[in-house]
Regions:
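Long, low-complexity, intrinsically disordered segments
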Residues: 258-279
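Active-site-proximal loop/helix segment associated with metal-binding centers of metalloenzymes
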Residues: 95, 109-186
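Beta-strand-turn-beta hairpins that frame and shape the catalytic cleft
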Residues: 1-4, 104-115, 162, 219-223
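Catalytic cores of nucleotide-sugar-dependent glycosyltransferases that transfer UDP/GDP/TDP-activated
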Residues: 9-13, 129-145, 186, 190, ...
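Conserved beta-sheet core of the metallophosphoesterase superfamily
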Residues: 63-67, 83-86, 91, 95, ...
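Core catalytic region of metal-dependent phosphoesterases/phosphodiesterases
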Residues: 6, 12-107, 184, 188-195, ...
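Short, solvent-exposed loop/turn segments at secondary-structure junctions
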Residues: 10-11, 41-42, 71-73, 118-122, ...
């Protein structure tokens, strides 16, 4: 079994990076996992396009896992069937697509993985989107979800292997700013301050996030992902890996796609009757 981690896919817009044209899936099975660090974007209104791309993911030779970002259809997402999977609560989105809920701890392939989705949309988004339709107050975790997270971490002794979030803790701001000016759009806020309190208490090996549209190590043990895919090392070696040197990181970045991933996949066709193949 293998675990891969990547950044936002924004429905079909950035999904090409996990297509066979950009990501070698040779030998993978449904016991291998691709984790998306938020802004999954394929659960909004149950449209034909969303159904097509969920079927496309089901046809891939891996299981897709994701934490939520700020660009999700929370009304539909939170209405999906819930179940316990690998020790934590999930929404089952498709046969092999699962939403890893907030404040959960999962045991996956020898890793203990804490998940805490959510982030605040930009002021521009809030002004130009429609509340309850294209942006939701649920994008930022509420008090109950944060209490659940604390309870989960208490039970785990404030110790885990990996943390998967959408936005980063506030202390990562300096590292993010070295690579992008997106903090002007998505500044650190009350929720990233709360994530900071988690980071300050938690013993962990590595923290992955999305949101900032960069591929960079933004703190000693924190990596932001967007187009790149990180393949986790075996748990035994990963747990000994701490630091900024590539040889000591608990993951290996897969080779960068030769072309812009968006150009490597045929976009959704409006006539679904012609979509006999999910390749």
């Amino acid at each position: 079994m293998s675990i891969f981690v990547t950044g936002d896919i924004h429905a079909s817009y950035d999904i090409a990076k996990i297509s066979e044209s950009c990501f070698d899936t040779t030998g993978l099975t449904k016991d291998d996992y691709v984790i998306v660090c938020g802004d999954f974007g394929l659960v909004w209104n149950n449209t034909a396009s969303e159904q097509y791309w969920l079927r496309w993911l089901d046809a891939r030779p891996f299981t897709t896992l994701f934490v939520d970002g700020n660009h999700e259809g929370f009304a539909l997402l939170n209405s999906l069937p819930e179940t316990t999977w690998n020790g934590g609560r999930v929404h089952q989105v498709a046969n092999s697509v699962f939403h890893l809920q907030r404040g959960q701890m999962f045991d996956i392939d020898g890793y203990r993985i804490f998940t805490m989705g959510g982030a605040a949309s930009s002021q521009y988004d809030r002004e130009h989107r429609v509340l309850g339709e294209t942006w939701f107050t649920e994008e930022v975790p509420n008090e109950q979800e944060r209490a659940t997270a604390i309870e989960t971490l208490d039970q785990a002794g404030w110790n885990c292997d990996l943390v998967i979030t959408h936005c980063a803790p506030t202390s990562a701001a300096k590292g993010i700013s070295k690579h992008t000016d997106r903090l002007e759009i998505h500044p650190m806020d009350e929720y990233t301050d709360w994530l900071q309190t988690i980071q300050d208490r938690l013993t962990y090996t590595h923290w992955f996030c999305g949101h900032y549209h960069i591929d960079a190590q933004i703190q000693e043990n924190t990596t932001a992902l967007y187009n790149r895919i990180a393949m986790l090392k075996e748990p035994e070696s990963a747990n000994d890996a701490k630091g900024s040197d590539a040889s000591t990181l608990p993951y290996q970045l897969l080779a960068e796609a030769a072309k812009e991933p968006k150009h490597e996949i045929t976009d959704y066709a409006t006539d679904l009757d012609d979509q006999d193949s999910l390749e």
